[in-house]
Amino acid sequence: MKHPSLIFLTGFSGSGKSTIGPLLANSLGYDFLDLDKEIERQADKPITRIFAEEGEDHFRERERAMLESIVGRKELVVSLGGGALQNNDCFSLIISSGTMVYLHSSPLILAKRMSHKTDRPLMKGENGERLSSEEIEKKILALLEHREPRYKTAQIMVETDTKRIGTTVEELTRKIERYVRRAEKNQNSHSQTKKQSRK
């Protein structure tokens, strides 16, 4: 069953999911789960090592199994990995079980934020070398071309380029609370209609 209060934060790496997620969960009074960090905890190694040693397909399988374990929960904010939606099984689980929120940032801003990180596969070239900011931006543009159509299927979207984190959290809290109320009301009305039709 779909639970509107199961919130999936999606967006490219560097869009603010891991920073905004726990603050948003606290504002809503929900629990919080960072999917990538939970996968790292269970695997007992960072994502860069999972990719290097097991390959992306195996990482996506871990991701799918983790998502299956939380389907059905309510009042939970989940920060997804940047590429989670590209796995068809993961995408189907997400859209059928909760509410998706897209944190949108421009490629230039994403590249600037990513240049400060060293723990992401995106930062590395084919031979494991560190990429320049310009190379990262080109890589982001290429990946966004494939990923953005699914990002844009989200029920809620906010820009995270220039807003303060607190402002973004407040905006998201209002939008999510309004959306969840409306969705739950529609679900209840639908349930009542089905019950009456059985009489």
Curated annotation (Swiss-Prot):
GO cellular component terms attached to this protein's record: cytosol
Pfam families: SKI
Cofactor note text: Binds 1 Mg(2+) ion per subunit.
Biological process annotations from GO: amino acid biosynthetic process; aromatic amino acid family biosynthetic process; chorismate biosynthetic process
EC number per UniProt: 2.7.1.71
Spans annotated as Disordered: 179-199
SUPFAM superfamilies associated with the record: P-loop containing nucleoside triphosphate hydrolases
Residues involved in Mg(2+) binding: 18
Keyword terms: Amino-acid biosynthesis, Aromatic amino acid biosynthesis, ATP-binding, Cytoplasm, Kinase, Magnesium, Metal-binding, Nucleotide-binding, Transferase
Binding site for substrate: 36, 60, 82, 147
Principal location listed in the UniProt entry: cytoplasm
Keyword Transferase: yes
Subcellular localization, as worded in the UniProt entry: Cytoplasm
Residues annotated to bind ATP: 14-19, 120
Listed pathway(s): Metabolic intermediate biosynthesis; chorismate biosynthesis; chorismate from D-erythrose 4-phosphate and phosphoenolpyruvate: step 5/7
Function according to Swiss-Prot or TrEMBL: Catalyzes the specific phosphorylation of the 3-hydroxyl group of shikimic acid using ATP as a cosubstrate.
Annotated family: Belongs to the shikimate kinase family.
Binding partners and assembly: Monomer.
Name used for this protein in its record: Shikimate kinase
Organism whose genome encodes this protein: Chlorobium phaeobacteroides (strain BS1)
